[in-house]
């Protein structure tokens, strides 16, 4: 068996693999000899079938297996010896397409190898950890929001104002024809909530019980029901009742509605929850800073195939975010831009770097951590938790999608422990501004 290098350009590698016909024949004979004891053929005792008949009966099938095994062994032997790690599955093609039994096998193998990742001086990385301590104002704001969400409504005499609730019947028509989903009875609508299409709720401000009013609106051009998008509609409304909001009192009774023993216990729960939220947000800000610094200080060649594949995935994802009504791949070819490629290069670079750092430092994701993450995701599908859990267990790709962010976060935490980290007390608004800035970059 002979392997000859034909291209070594950057990370690109190409080789010619030659498997001599004699090696192939020997492998075929060995496989047939191993199988002969179990072969039964009319006219011969079990295990006594002549080799010539075995070759005639099973030769083509065994030859195919022998060819595949020979090439696979040659490839693996080369990778083990060279230490190359292909970025993607190597492309293997048989070059002598007119091959016949008795000829050598000649195949070409091409791949891009993963680059050598340089070491990182963790101590040279300087990070700032934003610290926000939940204060009385933040707890009060959260309590007020809970009270607003727990508000009730009481019958009101007179005209409806913004923030009031109107209970009404309505029938919607387009071009004089009622449409499916365009009518309801005793529907409660809080004016100003934005629950209905733009322009609807504003026209109910000022109505009284027993009033009848035609509300004229136009459906948005991007309305989810395509047959209504952009159409003018008239809703005939009959007002049943007008109600004013009655805010819930911030007291022990409110606390009990939200599962706390009393108001002080609820305040403690809110403070703890806010603290957890602030820490999570601060961690996201610090993680971005860490990744930015790694991107700046570490440099190595990237496999073009990985960057291209990532750019296509980014372009595809962004296109679907802009066109949510289109499902699957039933759409025109999506072109990648320089912006897509630039973002892809950063993702590939940081992905390879974090993977290498994690491997070198024995960072792993435990079974318990995987189970916890899967259970957390499963709760997003009430009533289908078991089915979701079983799907993940049986799907290697889905498991990897769960494991990858866990692994990345653990590597980031490892680097964070080695880096120089300073704490900075900031306000909630400062933290929010820092988080908002992440989306703008």
From Swiss-Prot:
Signal sequence range: none
Gene3D superfamilies in the cross-refs: 3.10.50.40, Trigger factor ribosome-binding domain, Trigger factor, C-terminal domain
Subcellular location: Cytoplasm
Reaction catalysed by this enzyme: [protein]-peptidylproline (omega=180) = [protein]-peptidylproline (omega=0)
One of the protein's GO biological processes: protein transport
Enzyme superclass (EC): isomerase
Record-annotated PPIase FKBP-type domain positions: 163-248
EC number(s) reported in the record: 5.2.1.8
Disulfide bond annotation, renumbered to this chain: none
Pfam families hit by this protein: FKBP_C (PF00254), Trigger_C (PF05698), Trigger_N (PF05697)
Keyword set includes Cytoplasm: yes
Keyword annotations of the record: Cell cycle, Cell division, Chaperone, Cytoplasm, Isomerase, Rotamase
MF (Gene Ontology): peptidyl-prolyl cis-trans isomerase activity
Function as written in the Swiss-Prot or TrEMBL entry: Involved in protein export. Acts as a chaperone by maintaining the newly synthesized protein in an open conformation. Functions as a peptidyl-prolyl cis-trans isomerase.
Family: Belongs to the FKBP-type PPIase family. Tig subfamily.
HAMAP family named in the record: Trigger_factor_Tig
Domain notes: Consists of 3 domains; the N-terminus binds the ribosome, the middle domain has PPIase activity, while the C-terminus has intrinsic chaperone activity on its own.
Protein name: Trigger factor
UniProt source species: Jannaschia sp. (strain CCS1)
